Amino acid sequence: MKIITDTHLGHTNMLLYEPIRIQKARMEGYEDFDEFLIEWINDYIKKNDEVLHLGDVAFDNAYKLAKKLNGKITLIKGNHDKQKHIDFYKSIGWRIIDGIEIELNEFDKECLEKIKSKYDNKTLSDTACLVKEIGDKRILFSHYPVFNDNSYDEKYQKVTKLLQEIFNLCECDINIHGHTHSYCVGDKRCVNACLEVNDFVPMETN
């Protein structure tokens, strides 16, 4: 499975926040970042590859560019993925995770319901994640990092707390996340899948 996140197609301000984006595009001979990113990613991902996108696909009308991305894509909803965009992604065959999905043979479902009962509906809808075993690792995939030490993200602390409870309930080994771009949180259980820290190459799990 290939993993990408925070493509932010059409998000011109992101080129100011993360100048490495346009620098990388120009280094590869492109002036248009979206054109660069789509072609670059498609060099690594083929049409039949299973792909997990960890959120924040596109801004404004650039969401329609998503149909150019290769792969059989599952999207874990991020904070910038609007409902109009999600409806379009569904129409082009993407699978959408917009809640808590646990793909384990055994876990305490009753305990999960007790955990969920402590949170309001907005927090639950904002906490999209997938837990599954790959090889000998139990992984929680999410848009937000489970153990987030970035003070800028204090507004997401309810989501973070819920993610931590799910991580502990499922006895996960690692968290593969997006959202933080070039910032890497201090907790080594969190693996940043963002393009900026991976030379714009999709991560891969076997």
Locations of regions flagged by a protein language model:
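Active-site metal-binding loops of divalent metal-dependent hydrolases
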Residues: 5-9, 55-59, 79-81, 143-146, ...
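A short acidic, amphipathic alpha-helical/loop segment
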Residues: 62-68, 87-88, 155, 165
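N-terminal active-site segment of His-dependent metallophosphoesterases
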Residues: 1-65, 197
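Residues at the starts of beta-strands that form the adenosine-phosphate
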Residues: 50, 72, 189
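Short catalytic/ligand-binding loop motif for oxyanion handling, primarily in non-cytosolic enzymes
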Residues: 10-13, 60-62, 82-86, 148-150, ...
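Active-site HxH/HxHxD metal-binding segment of metal-dependent hydrolases
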Residues: 70-90
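Conserved beta-sheet core of the metallophosphoesterase superfamily
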Residues: 91-93, 98-109, 114-206
